[in-house]
Each structure stands twice: as structure tokens, then as C-alpha cells.
Amino acid sequence: MMNHFLIREKFLNFFKKNNHTIVSSSSLIPNDSSVLLTTAGMQQFKPYYLGDLDPIADFGSKNTASIQKCFRTSDIDEVGDETHLTFFEMLGNFSFGGYFKKEAISLAYEFLTKELNLNIEYVTVFDPKKVDANDWRKNVPEDKESFEIWKSLGISEDKIKKEGVDNFWGPTGSEGPCGPTTEIYIKNKNNQNVEIWNIVFNEYFCDTGQNLTKLKTAGVDTGMGLERLLMICQNAPTIFETDLFDSILKILPQNLPLKVKRIIADHLKGSVFLISDGVRPSNKEAGYVLRKILRRVIVYEHLYNFNQDVFVNIIDQIIQIYGKIYSNLNSDKNIIFDEIFKEKEKFEKTLKIGIKELEKIKEINSSDAFYLYETFGLPYEIIKELGKEKAENLNYLDFQKELEKHKVVSRQGQEKKFGGHGLVLDTGELKAGSKEEIQKVIRLHTATHLLQQALREVLGEKVRQAGSDINAKRMRFDFAFDR
């Protein structure tokens, strides 16, 4: 069985042999201030796609490959099922005018079928006939070239599926590079088809009016999740039965629900990497993400009353698994422990008060649940578990409605107090020091709403705001999108 070390080695050696410069993973905290965390392998190469930097000068090649640390906040609430993670690693090869479709597809095919001996179940390519008539991508030509390349490699026509907008990637904002994609699917142990590799051909620039023009230099951007690939190569039923998770899950008490085990393993792993890359628990930006996942784990520890040594052993095991790949985890070990246990000590005081409040309530309704959540950080599932009979009539839909109602009330209160824009001087989201700056911030605040609406029109209703930071000079808008 191939372990994760061997797969990493095979991937990097394969692309090095095929004239790619191997580039180390960048930090989870990107240099790009427009995003909160690193979510894909291409992020550190964005300036090269845009022509702002020269890959020859920096890498000695127009082709690179990397294994990138990634963290996606959009999946936090889904962690615990068979497929979702917050922290993961992405294998990728990239080209900034060095090669295009034929080479990109051929390299992917060779690596999967020859190096890893895997069988491709089917692939997908872009076809505008599958796109709605009024969609801005309707006039993009069918990707016949990719279709023919796959055929030439021995993939039969019935296994080359033509898809619509799901096979067109980008732009990542209101404008930028974009293009058709081809995706590779392989069957897992459960006989399910798993998308294993996505190859994006950035050949267009899309402006804010959704007009497409050909890029001067076309680029290739590919991504393949290491955890998914391990699941396939190790014939595991889920991503959690691979050697990146097995030894961690075995440390946890056996009486814990499987979902809880997975959440704890994922969230502590994410915490270790975020702290090592400089994030500290706080109420803002990446620090808030770290605080949220850490506190969720702390609540489960309290709920199931397992020994604190379990925490220590899991963190040790995570560092042991990844320390040979990311040596800074070893040197940062004391910092990682200090930050996690400082946050643990701080939150446990609030948690105890919250549980006492819960015990005072005779019958917990959605309003009570929201109060416990908002004031003491008790998640819905913990309220249900601790409340037992007192919470038997509480359901998640009512709890969600209470959350939405609170958002509406908050917005109305802000509008009444601050002239309809919800602005205060330095709230942590919107920052202004004078009336003149307030007017500038108001305009940028309005722009975030317009941007979000535009994103939804282009990418779909799944776009969700994940945060923003606005001052008189600039704005940052973070959003989550399930692709």
C-alpha cells in the first residue's frame, strides 16, 4: 500500500522529471489581502498568471508543481461526514505559457495510470450546448480539443462526458482569468465516482460586464486533493481511513460518535497548521476561524469528559505525521501547545457558566438556544445533547430561523443608529476616523453588497460572504464558494 510519503514523492519526482520546478507550499496566510486564507494551490502563482511577475526569473521555468497547504472555511459545518475537511493539501502543476491542453491532459493521464496504476472511470469536458441560453458562457466554443486528446489516450467516447458551467472555471472575482476545465473521475472502494483531478485552461479574461477576451498567454492550473487521492490509492472507504487520519482517530476514546471523532481530528489538525503559520485565536479574520474550530473541540471534550492527555497525544501525533514534511511544526511545537491550551483555559470558564445557564432553563426553545449560542458559544448540537429531555422539542430549523431573525434585528438597529449603513468608528469590520472617512467607507461598504450580488449572478446562489474588512482606503471581501 502506498503511504502519503510515497505518493508525495511520486508526484513531485514525476513533474520534476517532466521539466517542472518544484515550489514549496506557501503559508496558509496569503500575501493576497483580498482573501482570508490560502484555499488552492494556484494562489501563490496568481501574479504569474496575470503577467505581473516573470516565472523564468523566479523559478527558471514557465512550469511549476507544488503540494500546497489549504484551509477552506466554507466546509466547517460539514466536517464529520465522509468527504469534507477544513485543512487539506492540494497537489498541483501549473504552467504560465509553457504548455497547454495536450501536455496538461497527457501528464495527468500518465501520472494516474502509469505511476499510480489507477483506472480512470470517466472524464468531463466543456460543451456550451449544456449551458443556458442566456448564460455569459454560452458563446464559448466547445472544448473539442480536450475531447480529442482524451480519445487519443485511449479513453472511449462514452467515457468522455460533456458538461456545462460546471466545466468552466472562473473568474474568481468580478473579473479575471477563466476558462474551460476537464475533470477526471475514479471509482472509490464504495463504487462511487470521485472527482480526483481538475485541470483548468485559463485562456480568457472576463471583465465586469462578463465580456470575454483571449488572454495574451494561456495558462494551466490543476488541483488534486491529496486526501482524496490517498483514499483511492489505499482503497479506503473514506478520507478518514487513510494514513493521514488513522493513527489520530485511534487515540480518541472508542465510545465517541464517529462524526465527533472526525471533527476533533480535522479541527485540531487545522489548528496546528494555522498556529504554525502565525494565526492566533481572536475575534477577527483568520483568528476567529481558529477560535471557532478550537472551541468546538473543547466543547466536545467537556461533553464526553475525556482525559486532557488525549488532546496532547493528538497534537503530538499530528506533528509526528507532518513534521517530516513541514519541519516548522517541530520547531513551533511549544508555541502550538501554548496557544491551544491558553484558548482552552480561557473558553472553559465561559463554557462552565453557559452550561449552568442551560441547566436553569426548564424547557429549551429556539430563543433560549440562540441565547446560549450567542452568549456562551454553545453549538446547537451540544445544546441538544446537554439539554436532553429539556431540548427534545428544539429543532435545527427553528434555531436557524432565530439566527436569521437576529441578523435582521441587528441590521435594523444599525440603520436606525448610523443612518442606514450600519457603520461605526472602528468596529473591526468598518474603520473610519472622521465624517469624511465615514462617507468613503459608506461607498466601499455599498460596493461589498454589489460585489456579493455580482458574484451570485456569475457563480450562483451558493456564494456566501465569509467576512470583510473596510477602511477609508480599501475594502476586502471574503466569500465561500463550493468549488
Regions found by a protein language model. Name each.
Residues 1-483:
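A glycine- and charged-residue-rich anion-binding loop/surface
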